[in-house]
């Protein structure tokens, strides 16, 4: 197989594994087990926030955890496939191609996010993917994760509006790729502190800029109902149970 073949294989595996894993809706799984349909109660959204309204707290926490790691797990699988399967073969063919392809492993968590929003197992009717995107943020950069996590928790604790915290975070998320010293792809740089630069890594910055723009646009659009309710002061707080 040539270089193009291995790169195509990496892209296909990343998209396929990420999407299929992301399509697992843990709130729906809990609904089946507990006989309490998350899609018919509260905001009717099969996500983490509504799970706190519908299910016992421990169950909701578990759902939130699994929603986060369901973008981390496919990335980890693809990372192992890349490092121990594809990278050695690519190195034999053209060592210079490694620095131009490794970031494609991040297609896996991106596909997981779209799997959550449009799950094949649930007729493409999914959630808003806030928690699943948090997993993507975590595997991209600890600095991204720290900024987003602190912002989200601060706004949520003060306002009690998870939707408001999420919307603000995705506005910030939109601009993070344009600050290169925050783009620390730590899974590939565990031995030293490093970051991307416009001079040598511009195509990776463009990759994440496009990805973040698409995600922010779609997820904020999915919150359009929340925005209207926030403006009209009709939005439910996280503390409200059903």
Swiss-Prot record:
Record SMART domains: G3P_acyltransf
Localization: Cell membrane
GO molecular function, a single term: acyl-phosphate glycerol-3-phosphate acyltransferase activity
Root EC class: transferase
One Gene Ontology term from the biological process aspect of the record: phospholipid biosynthetic process
Pfam families cross-referenced by the UniProt entry: G3P_acyltransf
Keyword Electron transport included in the entry's annotation: no
TM region(s), chain numbering: 7-27, 61-81, 102-122, 135-155, 162-182, 201-221
Organism domain of life: Bacteria
EC number: 2.3.1.275
Pathway: Lipid metabolism; phospholipid metabolism
InterPro entries per record: G3P_acylTferase_PlsY
Oligomer and partners: Probably interacts with PlsX.
Known role: Catalyzes the transfer of an acyl group from acyl-phosphate (acyl-PO(4)) to glycerol-3-phosphate (G3P) to form lysophosphatidic acid (LPA). This enzyme utilizes acyl-phosphate as fatty acyl donor, but not acyl-CoA or acyl-ACP.
HAMAP family named in the record: PlsY
Protein name, as recorded: Glycerol-3-phosphate acyltransferase
Gene designation: plsY
